[in-house]
Amino acid sequence: MADAAAPDAASVRNFTINFGPQHPAAHGVLRLVLELDGEVVERVDPHIGLLHRGTEKLIEQKTYLQAIPYFDRLDYVAPMNQEHAFCLAVEKLLGIAVPRRAQLIRVLYAEIGRILSHLLNVTTQAMDVGALTPPLWGFEEREKLMMFYERASGSRMHAAYFRVGGVHQDLPPKLVDDIDAWCDAFPAVVNDLDRLLSDNRIFKQRNVDIGVVTLDQAWSWGFSGVMVRGSGAAWDLRKSQPYECYAELDFEVPIGKNGDCYDRYHIRMEEMRQSVRIMKQCIAKLRAPHGQGPVVVDDHKIFPPRRGEMKRSMEALIHHFKLYTEGFHVPAGEVYVAVEAPKGEFGVYLVSDGSNKPYKCKIRAPGFAHLQAMDFLSRGHLLADVSAILGSLDIVFGEVDR
């Protein structure tokens, strides 16, 4: 009788559940369909597109200046890094050189964006596995950094501060002093986080040997950024293909050797320290005599004249009117420019037909390539490990769905 009641092995089906799209550990509007054999993950099927807005198509209907704010809304955790890629692409087509002071300001704010992103990721990754203190410490520092964003651009998140040919306006000396003071105090916060998490028994159990990816697998999946460096490759576009003034800055590229969640956490922690190092060098150069000067290219066919000049000169008024109605024309051609964004290689493939609007702007989002490997990374792990793996990928849906 007992044998008759026992289920036949062939009739036992795997259990399918939904993870998200309103899940607190989903890091946005992610829906994962998980196929489970007990607690073990057999298959992960990511469903994306819930935040799709047609960004690439919208950019085709805007002038080059109007397109910049769309890039803030991709990886909205570190907005200026995306603007950077687009501006570099347009500048390459125009064949213009950015003034040195503008380059230093761009690099300074790109590194602020990197710290903003890594702080959010490291602390929420800790929260995903049960540590509730780090997010409180991390958000306190992020608040200060977003104030620096606001003081430079007027906006905490969607800055639209970078311009083709430079940046919108110069930084006041008091702001540079405050950023310098913050750089002196911040390493102590990273050390506190390090002490709290790095040797914590529970944190290590949840991250060591979880979501392991070898270097060959990382390359074949199209990984970049921390995902590749965690597997042992010192591939950082700031070093391998330097842009702006990165070639003259002194910093290290941290790499891991195991390719697991724990290594990726350590790399992000060390990258925050290196970013502070870069910021200190930028501030020193901004204060030096050779760091003074204009913050935008001196060409009124690309960047509008000052308001005071516009009220005195008819030519300046015409330039201003033409730039804000028609915009500037970019020579026909195509270009691919990539920057080392906090999430990985953020690329812009820009095609111009010689008009005042992009013919095509293809965006290469690093998170998109990382998310496609979610099934590969999660198979054979327990259900509880899915949120740890997802946290270590550092996914933001603005750039994945665009």
From Swiss-Prot:
NCBIfam families: NuoD, PRK06075.1. It is a peripheral membrane protein. PROSITE patterns: COMPLEX1_49K. GO terms for molecular function: NAD binding; NADH:ubiquinone reductase (non-electrogenic) activity; quinone binding. HAMAP family: NDH1_NuoD. NDH-1 is composed of 14 different subunits. Subunits NuoB, C, D, E, F, and G constitute the peripheral sector of the complex. It comes from Rhodopseudomonas palustris (strain ATCC BAA-98 / CGA009). It holds the Pfam family Complex1_49kDa. It is an enzyme of class 7 (translocase). Its EC number is 7.1.1.-. One of its GO terms (cellular component) is plasma membrane. The gene is nuoD. It catalyses: a quinone + NADH + 5 H(+)(in) = a quinol + NAD(+) + 4 H(+)(out). InterPro entries: NADH_Q_OxRdtase_suD (IPR001135), NADH_UbQ_OxRdtase_49kDa_CS (IPR014029), NDH1_su_D/H (IPR022885), NiFe-Hase_large (IPR029014). The keyword Cell cycle does not apply. It is found in: Cell inner membrane. This is NADH-quinone oxidoreductase subunit D. Keywords: Cell inner membrane, Cell membrane, Membrane, NAD, Quinone, Translocase, Transport, Ubiquinone. SUPFAM superfamilies: HydB/Nqo4-like. Belongs to the complex I 49 kDa subunit family. NDH-1 shuttles electrons from NADH, via FMN and iron-sulfur (Fe-S) centers, to quinones in the respiratory chain. The immediate electron acceptor for the enzyme in this species is believed to be ubiquinone. Couples the redox reaction to proton translocation (for every two electrons transferred, four hydrogen ions are translocated across the cytoplasmic membrane), and thus conserves the redox energy in a proton gradient.
